[in-house]
């Protein structure tokens, strides 16, 4: 069997004939490149194929090691006592492992939460150099100014933003005490996780991101919300949507779509820099009971300065300038991608989410055919604007308001039908 397998393709033909021409070698190179490209595309489309198997047994071992480090004074956190001593933060099940990231479900005093970390072990994170260098018990003599400088530098590395000292409150380890060294080491591990930094920064500024509930070492806890999935008929679980069958779901979808629009406008306008979402798919969002959209995975979210830094790479064509859902254009005069993103969050949401809902008639006869047709056309225009890159922002603003008005009109028709 091994011999037969090895004889396949141009290389096998060469061995059988005993010679290879230049054309055959070129064909073999193309054949090999095709397989390499296919493998790369498979890994990009399905990164989970290289992920570890998510098991409850391994997850329990990970948390046991975390608690052992806590009891040894290596790490600290406001959830460590509940997890490791009081038994009030209880592991429930493994949700997923993905390229090192561990995501676990737990119960915290009767509340479902998610424990997250970019790495399995606390020792996987580089230590804070000041802790290694400073003499004195627990680094108690460490100058506060140096700490602030290092925290600000790590936040800038994660976000690409310069923050004032007064903005660093979410990441300050608190008063010095017997666990000060463990607190600093834990803070440093958390600051090396971009998602934690985003959630911490935005939790008091946005209803569309998860608040951080607490942490223990390198693991942090957020609210558990059921993620979307392409396996759901409506992308998100809407089984309990109020109202009559069909009409209730149509109303829920319209409410959720309006919340997506609110999130887009919020991320575009309400921070000092635009926030770009480069991995838009149902699995990265969840819906609250009031149909508010929440971004539950922001590993691929970037503020404008960081986005420009990521996009501005060498290129030989436009395809080299695509960073997941964030696209740029290749300037062939200098073989460099433009730093300006040429598509936008709304365009990708229309393409990957709204198309699923509005490309076919809504499951409710209460919405007029004309309104449904207008909504379909607006979603198509949004997903594929067909305008020069310099005009995309103006076009996005126009279609944003058009979609908003059509969705509000849809809700009015559904509400009238309920009377």
From Swiss-Prot:
Q: Where does the protein end up?
A: Endoplasmic reticulum membrane
Q: How is it modified after translation?
A: Among the many cysteines in the lumenal domain, most are probably involved in disulfide bonds.
Q: What are the entry keywords?
A: Disulfide bond, Endoplasmic reticulum, Membrane, Signal-anchor, Transmembrane, Transmembrane helix
Q: Which Pfam family is one of this chain's hits? A: PIP49_N
Chief localisation class: endoplasmic reticulum
The species is Homo sapiens (Human)
Its placement in the membrane is given as: Single-pass type II membrane protein
Instruction: Kindly list the GO CC terms recorded for this protein.
Output: endoplasmic reticulum membrane
Entry similarity comment: Belongs to the DIPK family.
Q: Which InterPro entries match?
A: FAM69_kinase_dom, FAM69_N, Kinase-like_dom_sf
Q: What is this protein called?
A: Divergent protein kinase domain 1C
Query: Where's the motif May mediate ER retention?
Result: 16-17
List the SMART domains hit by this protein, alphabetically: PIP49_N
Query: Where, by residue number, does the polypeptide cross the bilayer?
Result: 23-43
Q: Does the keyword NAD apply?
A: no
Residues assigned to the Cytoplasmic compartment are 1-22
Per the record, ranges on the Lumenal side are 44-419
